[in-house]
Design a protein with these regions (language model features):
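Non-catalytic signal-transmission and effector/linker regions of two-component phosphorelay proteins
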Residues: 1-13, 112-136
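Conserved acidic segment of CheY-like receiver
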Residues: 10-22, 27-31, 59
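Short hydrophobic/Thr-rich beta-strand motif most characteristic of the beta2 strand and flanking loop
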Residues: 35-42, 50
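Acidic catalytic/metal-coordinating carboxylates
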Residues: 42-46, 69-73
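Conserved phosphotransfer cores of two-component systems
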Residues: 52-54, 76-84, 101
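Active-site beta3 strand of CheY-like receiver
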Residues: 54-60
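Receiver (REC) domain active-site loop signature in two-component systems and cognate sites
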Residues: 65
């Protein structure tokens, strides 16, 4: 029986990939406050390595990164784990259209606090009740 049938024991694993360590720490703290298990990687290669060894349900990847950009990471993630949902983030508005076709959703970093949780819930097929208020 899959653990997802026992919600009291199931905490989905999310993987955040961003070259900005401060952003990664904020994402991790925010998502863990809502019960997610969060893995982080500071570049695409490390993220792909983590995804190959963990049952990651959702990948949240920044578009603008050195070495491998978010589109390249998403393409390789699709090959590695086709069942994994991918959300692309960017602080800029000039993400190429073809990059958006590789992912399941896009969230602007300026809307992270209000859009990330509903986007994750929608992709996972969860009831889209408003998330509980975050208490710091």
């Amino acid at each position: 029986m899959p653990l997802s049938l026992y919600p009291e024991y199931y905490h989905p694993v999310l993987l955040c990939i961003d070259d900005d360590e401060d952003v990664l720490e904020c994402e991790k703290t925010f998502l863990e406050a809502f019960g997610y298990n969060v893995l982080t990687a500071s570049n695409g290669g490390k993220g792909l390595e983590l995804a190959s060894t963990h049952a990651v349900e959702v990948v949240i990847v920044d578009y603008f990164m050195p070495q491998m950009n978010g589109e390249e990471v998403a393409l390789e993630m699709r090959r590695l784990r086709p069942e994994t949902f991918i959300i692309m983030l960017s602080g800029a508005v000039d993400v190429p259209e073809q990059a958006l076709h590789v992912v399941d959703a896009f969230v602007a970093k300026s809307c992270l606090a209000t859009q990330l949780l509903p986007t994750i819930a929608l992709l996972r097929g969860c009831a889209c009740d408003p998330p509980p208020t975050y208490q710091a």
